[in-house]
Every structure is written in structure tokens, then in C-alpha cells.
Amino acid sequence: MDFSIPQQRAIDIRNTNVVVSASAGSGKTAVLVERLCQLVLKDHISIDSILAMTFTKDAAAEMKARLLSKLKEQPQTKYILQQMALLETASISTIDSFCLSIVQNYYYKIPISYTMSKQTASSAQTRIAFENAYKHAIEALDLNAYTQLKMYFHSFGKTEEDIQKYIEDILAILNSKSEDDAKVWIKNIQASYTYLNPTLMEYALKYFHNHCLAMSEILDEVIPMISKSEDYEIKQDYLSKCLNASTYSDFKAQFELYLKNTIGFKKTIDKVDYSKYQTSFKEHETSIVENLFDEEFYLKDIQSHKHLIDTLFELTNKVKLYFQLEKKKMEVIDFNDMEHFAYQLLQDPMIKEEMYNKYQMILVDEFQDTNELQEKIIASFCHENNVFRVGDIKQSIYGFRQANPKIMQNWMKMKDINNTPLLLQENYRSNASVIEFNNDFYSKIMNNELLGQQFEDIDIANVGTDGQKEQPQYPVRFLYTEYKDDEGNKATIKKNHNENRFDLIAHDIIEKHKEGIPYKSMCANT
């Protein structure tokens, strides 16, 4: 296989940490496998000195199969035969399996029983253990505190089941962090209920600025079209002052002056219908009026809820404790335990040194799906320049396990003697229209004024070959539908909505086929 210059650089580069941002269709897997092969065949790094981690067993199995195929193509020397023998037990696995291997080797240092280290909890066992833990935690919690928490949730139409769901969501976040980081995260959340969070105030200011900017742009269109524009120019002046406000307090003061000293936007000006402008202008204005808040009142309000947050975290910690006890009774561990126990063991100097000496090279696939704890696990025993990471933030799919694509983004911005970011931006798989659509689509859904730019220039995919441009360029259609959340059975409403949506897609496919587009050339992503 011939590799492009960027692909070959990713294969050949040595003596540095590498993070590769690889778009879909860029040959990422081929590059990763070829690099692995070259490490074994050219650098003569034994396969048992390489750690390769991915996020699915299938991907790990494919990596092993491709490497075995490459080894079979080589002259069957003693070294090659040795590598083929080592491949079966090589550390090419999911990160969970790697963590489990550490736990099983050093279980007695945690300490847990040998039986517990060998038994992974089934989903049914995990659910039973959690339900029992939750029941025990409620019983151990102060009754008055829990009653107040229930009443607060009930005031928003939430039930005790919703409290349990919140606890599970919090635990998912805590499980993605080390014990120390989890404690800091909880303390920061609790502290945020004692003061006005500067980040929150910045978000609020951005939100209001965006609406003011939209109002100002409408006036820019309208003012040149009307003869007597003085009142609207006054509105524009006040909006300019709002936009120049650098703090929330200043913005609030300026906007209140705007409301007090300007007239409303009329539907008819100079006998001309301006209702479409007026409607849009009013929507933005109303969004500000309805969401503007008094800082002192808001601070008192959040402070009055701090005891509820404290209760929520106290309940979470109790559930976490009882959950561990329930699993210990069953003598099982779950996936979260594997990572936490592995990280705990890697803080032991002897184990850390052993792992450091064992692995000369570390490869991490699907790096965009790494969470904070997994990154800390790798950092616990890696060398200063022996980790090769590859991923694509657009393909991050493990949000439910608290995957954090920002970890990869931060590595991509880190360039020094020990860190080299590389780009594989050429998509060799899709035709040009699909690539262009994806770039446009992701730039819109991943970037917004409040959360900042998540999709950057380095994430843009390019067409790999001229042949992809010469292919028939069928349009890509994005269908967005939403259903009204009216009174009634929500499951039935959603089912009917989905059926209508699928009927619409099916009808559209049939019509396109009648126009001569073959079925194999159409794709509907749902």
C-alpha cells in the first residue's frame, strides 16, 4: 500500500509523543497498523514491549489480525516466529482489558479477593448491586434532609426516580475522574453555590450580547429604508452602549436605560409593512427581558439552595460506598472498578516502575473517547516521549462514559520537543459532496457563541483524490424533525413521530430511485 506524505510521517516519526487528528476515511487504521508493524519489524521492538489500546474488542482483534498477516509475509526467522508466538498474549486490547490485567496481577495490593479480580459483573448484577446500594443510602441519610430534597424535586414535577437518575449521572462523572479529582470537582460545585460564578456571568453576558447584536443588525437594515429614523437611531445608540458593556452589571444598567428611553418597534412605518422585522426584533428583545436577572437576588437564591446540593452529594457518596460493598459481597468488579483499581495500583512505585520498564511504546486508538481517568492511567507509567495517540473529535461517541474530546484538543495545541501534533485531513473514502456536507454540518453543530469553537480548521476534512471529485455528486440531505411534547402517553407520541419520520424518508428514497439514483448510492443517517 502506498501512503501519502502525512500518513508516512505518522508511521515513521520517533522519539516524541505524537497525537494525530485523523478524519474519517483518512486511512487511520492502516497507518496505526503499519506503525505497529514497523515498530516490530524495523525497530525490532518486541511485541510484548508494546501496549496498543482501543475502545472495542473488535478493533483490537482486527489490529492483531492485520499484524499477524504482516508477520506471515516476512521470512520466517527466529525473531518473526517469536513475535507470532507472542502475539496471542500481546497487550493489544481495550483499555478496560488492560486495566483488568493490572488488577488481576496485583489484586492483593488493593486489597480484593482473587475471586473478585476474576469476575466481571454482568449488567444484571450491576443493576441489583446499585438498587440495593441506593436503598441502603436512603436509609442512612438524614430523613429531614432527604424530605427537603424530594420536595424540591417535586416542585419541578420530578419524582424520586428522577433523584436516582441524577445520582447515577453524578456517579458517571465521578467515575471518569481519579478519587482526588472527583473530590475537587464536588468541592468546586458546592462552592459555586456561595458566590456568583464568573464563568456563568460571562456566559450570561455573551447570551445577552448575541440578542443585542441581532437587534442592532435588524436596525441596520431598517434605518436606511425609513424617512423619519430618529427614534430608531436612538434605539441603535442605546444598543451600542449595551454591546460595549464589559460586565453583566454594566449591561443590565444600559439595557434598562434602553427600555426606559426608547419607543417600541412599530409594525408599520411610513405606511410600509415592517412586521417581519418587528416580529424578529421583538423576539430578541423579549429573550433579554425575560432572562435578565438581579445579581443580588440571584446570589441569595443560589445560596438558599446550597444545603440541597450538599444533601445530593452526601447521598451520592453514600450510594458510592454501599455500591462498592454490594459488589464486594457478590465478589465482582465492574468496568469502572477496573480503571479505578488500575490507577490506584499504578501509584505504587514498584508497579509503576515495572510498567514503565515493560512498555517501550504505547499506542492509543480512538483517543477522542478518552476520559480524564484513562488519560491519568497512561500518564502514570509512560515515558516522556513514547505515546502515539490517534483520533477524531467528530467521532466521539462515548459521552455516556464521560469521554472528553477536549483532552485530545489540548494535546493538538501542545507542540514542543516531546510532543508533535500531526494531521491526516484527506478523506479517501467519500465523494466530495459528502465531505463538504460533513465539514459544514459539524462546523454548525459543534460551534456556538456560548461554548466556543469545538470544530476548528484542523478538523476540516479535504477530498483525498481528484477521482472523488469526478464521481457523480449526489446531494446530502439533513432531515430534522421534532415532535410536540403534548399531554398523553409520551412513548406513543414518540413512536408515532418516528413512524411518520421513517415513512417520509422511505418515500423520499423511492422518489429518488424513480429519478434514476440507484439504491446503493443513497444513505440515510438517523
Residue spans of the language-model regions?
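Alpha-helical scaffold elements adjacent to nucleotide-binding pockets in ATP/GTP-utilizing enzyme cores
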Residues: 31, 35, 62-70, 98-105, ...
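Helicase-core coupling region on the C-terminal RecA-like lobe
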Residues: 165-168, 423-514, 522
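Conserved RecA-like ASCE P-loop NTPase motor core of nucleic-acid helicases/translocases
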Residues: 46-60, 67, 90-92, 365, ...
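Conserved ATP-driven helicase/translocase motor core recognized via long
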Residues: 49, 164-332, 503, 510
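Conserved nucleotide-binding/hydrolysis micro-motifs of P-loop NTPases
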Residues: 26, 57-60, 69, 96-99, ...
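P-loop NTPase Walker
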Residues: 1-111, 326-336, 350-353, 395
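Conserved helicase NTPase motor core
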Residues: 3-4, 11-12, 17-21, 51-52, ...
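Short, polar/flexible loop-turn hinges at active-site or ligand-entry regions and domain interfaces
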Residues: 44-48, 72-89, 106-124, 134-149, ...
